[in-house]
Regions:
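Extended alpha-helical targeting/anchoring segments
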Residues: 1-257
Length: 257
């Protein structure tokens, strides 16, 4: 069972910056940021201002029977899990195959059990770990004495996988299918990429989060993959026997009932 130790947070933003700097040295880390100090969300939808987990006690990755493996892993460990479920999991659940080139080469699913979990709520920091109070005090002091991230200009030029002409031609075809009733809605996406770039993903997340102030921001590092998310939407939240989804589309009230 994890121990929990509590510390007072003097400057929330500086703490987040220092945690991002500290987390650079670990292959496994995850920051979940609600930006609740900026945007007032209903308390029932936001339990913490931020959660930061890092270092790995154990981890699991899979490309076959992933849901069953994750279920068994969680059943065995019964602890915090941080990670991702990829889009290509659909190919495991249904007789489907992705035709688009995968330039990231990520697993269908990957999760880790962190050695340390930092829970920031109100003005208090709760640290969960199997370590002693003495060890955690040293760790806390090391983090507090970190330098903050430097806010500097980051210039990235992206390329599109499709030309403007091809993109507009596909949009024309999609509109035709909508007009004749084959479909009523579609999300059409294309990749924007840069294969030759050197940038600190921690600094990039910190800067973008300052701009977007998203209620469901996250920064995940698993092995050699970094994922930055600055989303206004939550896919799913499970709380005891209740499941909540918070999408943007289709949620506005249209009448009194």
């Amino acid at each position: 069972m994890r121990n929990r130790f509590i510390y007072k947070v003097k400057d929330f933003d500086k703490l987040i910056s220092k945690l991002l700097v500290f987390g650079k040295s670990f292959k496994y880390s995850c920051l979940l940021h609600s930006n609740s100090s900026i945007k007032k969300l209903p308390k029932k939808y936001s339990n913490f201002k931020a959660i930061f987990a890092f270092d790995s006690i154990s981890n699991i990755s899979s490309n076959h029977h992933s849901f069953n493996k994750l279920k068994e892993f969680h059943k065995k460990e019964k602890d915090w899990l941080f990670g991702y479920l990829s889009y290509d999991l659909k190919n495991e659940s249904y007789n489907l195959k992705s035709k688009i080139n995968d330039n990231i080469k990520s697993d269908n699913m990957s999760f880790f059990i962190p050695k340390y979990v930092f829970l920031i709520k109100d003005k208090m920091l709760h640290i969960e770990s199997f370590e002693s109070k003495k060890v955690i005090d040293i760790l806390y002091d090391e983090i507090i004495n970190q330098c903050c991230l430097v806010d500097k200009n980051i210039s990235i030029i992206f390329k599109s996988r499709e030309s403007k002409e091809i993109y507009l031609e596909k949009i024309k075809k999609i509109k035709h299918h909508i007009q004749i009733g084959d479909i009523y809605e579609i999300n059409y996406c294309q990749e924007f990429y840069n294969n030759n770039i050197s940038v600190s993903t921690a600094e990039l997340f910190y800067k973008l989060n300052k701009i977007t102030e998203s209620p469901f921001a996250s920064f995940l590092n698993i092995d050699n993959i970094s994922v930055i998310c600055l989303s206004p939407e939550r896919y799913l939240l499970k709380n005891i026997n209740q499941i909540i989804s918070q999408p943007i589309k289709g949620t506005s009230k249209r009448s009194s009932n």
